[in-house]
Curated annotation (Swiss-Prot):
NCBIfam families: L29. Belongs to the universal ribosomal protein uL29 family. The keyword Magnesium does not apply. GO terms for molecular function: structural constituent of ribosome. This is Large ribosomal subunit protein uL29. Keywords: Ribonucleoprotein, Ribosomal protein.
């Protein structure tokens, strides 16, 4: 099973509260990564930007599926 499918399966098992916490943690991590890049304190791993953004998008999609707001 690919990493993406494992993540989606894991996200679908979480409750809405757990999904909110997961989204919040990932947004905080993305913000701190952007701050590090702006301050240029460390060598920033740029591939993490897209990884966090995609993870946030996937988790928000699963959250909307649970709320019944996704078409398709």
């Amino acid at each position: 099973m690919s990493v993406k499918k494992k993540l989606l399966a894991e996200l679908r098992q979480k409750s809405l509260v757990e999904l909110d916490a997961f989204i919040h943690e990932n947004k905080k991590a993305l913000f701190s990564l952007r701050a590090e890049a702006a301050l240029q304190n460390k060598a920033v791993k740029t591939h993490l930007f897209s990884m966090y953004k995609k993870t946030i998008a996937r988790s928000m999609t699963v959250k909307q599926e649970k709320e019944g707001k996704v078409d398709g």
